[in-house]
């Protein structure tokens, strides 16, 4: 891994010889900067504007060079508000791209796009920084072995398994359990894989970012008493930030994740919420730079921008970055260029269902809508594949019978269909699971269920061996042995009541 050798802390590197320019034009978040002949900065170099505005307030704005215009001018996009900037102000070329702090000291902290901490906990205790612009790993470095990334969550591991070093799309509206699922994954990768997580909040609401931080502290994912024991680093570039910040915050989070993968040789989970906002910010910047828009008004470089981010998210021989990306679908139109370009990179989709959440089935992952390219016999094995297919078939048949049940009732079904419905209801409940991070809310201890245990449990339900057990025994338990123990307890309780 190429680590920028600067020891100047986050944001930008320093040069002994300053290359100075001056602001020639300001159009919103875009600056044109004039430099002396022969002293033009490179594309993606960080420029810093320091000075005072008309009322004497200190200004410190970092920009990134996007275009070389000719006539010794460059066009740069600001990473923070340009309020108070004036023509003629001095601009320093740092001679390097934006660099952000990396390493264990970033865990438990919140950063902005420049790698500056924004959580009022003081400076970050690291002198190692890394530039946010890097090429993707070379073919020779990639790990080509297809392997499943075990999450310990039954419904995910059985029906839509994640690929180690893969990319997963997370679809779900408000209030169906996206945040809790994300926090459980962060918790499980730390405990089962010794891995860490990086969360990139790209263009979402500031309130949601604050809520996530508070919930992480409450559930122990971020350890307030000993910040070094935390399992996640947070990088936020929210809705109120300029488009330059929203466009680059995903790269800041990815750079932190790459260090854990390449130097610490760990498995890393990278969350991006929301990948659509990354595209949206790129579209705004593209228009500000005067590029001709493409389909539906998106930037002509949409595929290139998405590819440059997604291709860096991969498994190497050192470690892996597995990415879970929340995908907003504008107007529910899956053919929109933004989600359509995202789908090309995804290995699996996890769809959260409001109907399941309303029934109290958590995690509310839809077993029929969620998909994975990993669910093939040659990758997961015949036993896993057959069990998953039978679970899906049983769930699909139950879904088809629901209208008949609603109109005529269960008694009008054939004996075979009644058996299918009974097993499907047990499966539906057994797909629920108590989470470690939800212990503080539910009072039930969390459960991590290995893949072999998950397959065994569903095979027993499908075989009919557990037909005599009540369906409530399968609700919010870990493995199948807990379900049988719960059934015995329910039987004892009912006998005592009599």
Swiss-Prot record:
Keywords tagged on the record: ATP synthesis, ATP-binding, CF(1), Chloroplast, Hydrogen ion transport, Ion transport, Membrane, Nucleotide-binding, Plastid, Thylakoid, Translocase, Transport
Keyword Acyltransferase tagged: no
GO cellular component: chloroplast thylakoid membrane; mitochondrion; proton-transporting ATP synthase complex
Binding site for ATP: 172-179
One Pfam assignment: ATP-synt_VA_C
Gene Ontology annotations of biological process type: proton motive force-driven mitochondrial ATP synthesis
Catalytic activity: ATP + H2O + 4 H(+)(in) = ADP + phosphate + 5 H(+)(out)
E.C. numbers: 7.1.2.2
InterPro entries the record matches: AAA+_ATPase, ATP-synt_VA_C, ATP_synth_F1_bsu, ATPase_a/bsu_AS, ATPase_alpha/beta_chains, ATPase_F1/V1/A1_a/bsu_N, ATPase_F1/V1/A1_a/bsu_N_sf, ATPase_F1/V1/A1_a/bsu_nucl-bd
Organism superkingdom: Eukaryota
SUPFAM superfamilies xrefs: C-terminal domain of alpha and beta subunits of F1 ATP synthase, N-terminal domain of alpha and beta subunits of F1 ATP synthase, P-loop containing nucleoside triphosphate hydrolases
Gene3D superfamilies with a match to the protein in the record: 2.40.10.170, Bovine Mitochondrial F1-atpase, Atp Synthase Beta Chain, Chain D, domain 3, P-loop containing nucleotide triphosphate hydrolases
Cellular compartment(s): Plastid, Chloroplast thylakoid membrane
Keyword Iron: no
Main subcellular location of this protein, as a coarse class: plastid
Lipid bilayer topology: Peripheral membrane protein
Single annotated GO MF: ATP hydrolysis activity
PANTHER family reported for this sequence: ATP SYNTHASE, ATP SYNTHASE SUBUNIT BETA, MITOCHONDRIAL
Quaternary organization: F-type ATPases have 2 components, CF(1) - the catalytic core - and CF(0) - the membrane proton channel. CF(1) has five subunits: alpha(3), beta(3), gamma(1), delta(1), epsilon(1). CF(0) has four main subunits: a(1), b(1), b'(1) and c(9-12).
Function: Produces ATP from ADP in the presence of a proton gradient across the membrane. The catalytic sites are hosted primarily by the beta subunits.
HAMAP family from the UniProt entry: ATP_synth_beta_bact
NCBIfam families membership: atpD
Family indicated by similarity: Belongs to the ATPase alpha/beta chains family.
Name of the protein in its database record: ATP synthase subunit beta, chloroplastic
Upper classification of the organism: Eukaryota, Viridiplantae, Streptophyta, Embryophyta, Tracheophyta
């Amino acid at each position: 891994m190429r680590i920028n050798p600067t020891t100047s802390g986050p944001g930008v590197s320093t040069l002994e010889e300053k290359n100075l320019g001056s602001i020639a034009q300001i159009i919103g978040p875009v600056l044109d900067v004039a430099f002396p002949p022969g002293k033009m900065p490179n594309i993606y170099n960080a420029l810093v504007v320091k000075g005072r505005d008309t009322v004497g307030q200190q200004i410190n704005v970092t920009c990134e060079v996007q275009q070389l215009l000719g006539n010794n001018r460059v066009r740069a996009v600001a990473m923070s508000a340009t309020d108070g900037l004036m023509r003629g102000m001095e601009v320093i070329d740092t001679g390097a791209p934006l660099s952000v702090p990396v390493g264990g000291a970033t865990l438990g902290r919140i950063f902005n796009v420049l790698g500056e901490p924004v959580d009022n906990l003081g400076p970050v205790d690291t002198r190692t920084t890394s530039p946010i612009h890097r090429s993707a790993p070379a073919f020779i470095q990639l790990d080509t072995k297809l392997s499943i990334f075990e999450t310990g969550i039954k419904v995910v591991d059985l029906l839509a398994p994640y690929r180690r070093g893969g990319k997963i799309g997370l679809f779900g509206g408000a209030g169906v359990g996206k945040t809790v699922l994300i926090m459980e994954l962060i918790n499980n990768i730390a405990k089962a894989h010794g891995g860490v997580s990086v969360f990139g909040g790209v263009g979402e609401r500031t309130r949601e970012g604050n809520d996530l931080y508070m919930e992480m502290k409450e559930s122990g994912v971020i350890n307030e008493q000993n910040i070094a024991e935390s399992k996640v680093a947070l990088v936020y570039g929210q809705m109120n930030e300029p488009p330059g910040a929203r466009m680059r915050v995903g790269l800041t989070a990815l750079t932190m994740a790459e260090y854990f993968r390449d130097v610490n040789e760990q498995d890393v989970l990278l969350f991006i919420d929301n990948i659509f906002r990354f595209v949206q910010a790129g579209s705004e910047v593209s228009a500000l730079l005067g590029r001709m828009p493409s389909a539906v008004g998106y930037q002509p470089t949409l595929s290139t921008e998405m590819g440059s981010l997604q291709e860096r998210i991969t498994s190497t021989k050192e470690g892996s970055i597995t990415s879970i990306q929340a995908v907003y679908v504008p107007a529910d139109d899956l053919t929109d260029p933004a989600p359509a370009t995202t789908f090309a990179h995804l290995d699996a989709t996890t769809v959260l269902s409001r109907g399941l959440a309303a029934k109290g089935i958590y995690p509310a992952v839809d077993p029929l809508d969620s998909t994975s390219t990993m669910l093939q016999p040659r990758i997961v094995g015949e036993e896993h594949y057959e069990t998953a297919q039978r679970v899906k078939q049983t769930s699909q048949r139950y879904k088809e019978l629901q209208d008949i049940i609603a109109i005529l009732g269960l008694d009008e079904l054939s004996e075979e269909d009644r058996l299918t419905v009974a097993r499907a209801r047990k499966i539906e409940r057994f797909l629920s699971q108590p989470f470690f991070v939800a212990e503080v809310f539910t009072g039930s201890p969390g459960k991590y269920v290995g893949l072999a245990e998950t397959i065994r449990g569903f095979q027993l339900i499908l075989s009919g061996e557990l037909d005599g057990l009540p369906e409530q025994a399968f609700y919010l338990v870990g493995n199948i042995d807990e379900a049988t123990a719960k059934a015995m307890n329910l039987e004892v309780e009912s006998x005592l009541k009599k």
